[in-house]
Amino acid sequence: MSHELAATPVERVKRALADCGLDPNLVRELPADTSTAEAAARAVDAPLGSIVKSLVFLVYGATEGIPGAPAERTPLLVLVSGDQRADVHRLRAALGLSKKRLRIAQPAEVLDSTGFEVGGVPPIGHWATVRTLIDRTLSRFDVVWAAAGSPNAVFPIAYSRLVTIANGEAIDLVEEF
């Protein structure tokens, strides 16, 4: 097992932050649960909207539905504001995908795709490169709080810096009420 694979999820996030030129000590491991946006907002005493919700989707490739062909699956990370809901129809339209080609990942698939468990999926430090879409509603806040690899670890970051370190694509993805 490589040194990278042996690192804990939080250590991987700290290493990824350092690789981006950020202080790994930004990561706060808290006694409180931060696995939901509401819990994270309470734990860091921040507005709900400043919490980054991480949603992992699976995009199915062109072989989907062809008898005998393996289903190609590519993970897609979608980051939205804690006080918003991702609009799957809008997401599909932005990606030019049919309903059959995009679905939310199950917890085991999230772990397999990113190396992190649901409730702790960060914007960086994944096993492999994951395409990342970041909703623009997060830009309302000077500082946003992202998961740091476990259900009780988070880190603060400016929205623009989040887009940069995640190699993310800023896009409008939330439901309009």
Label every PLM stretch briefly:
Residues 1-177:
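Extended, low-hydrophobicity, polar/charged segments
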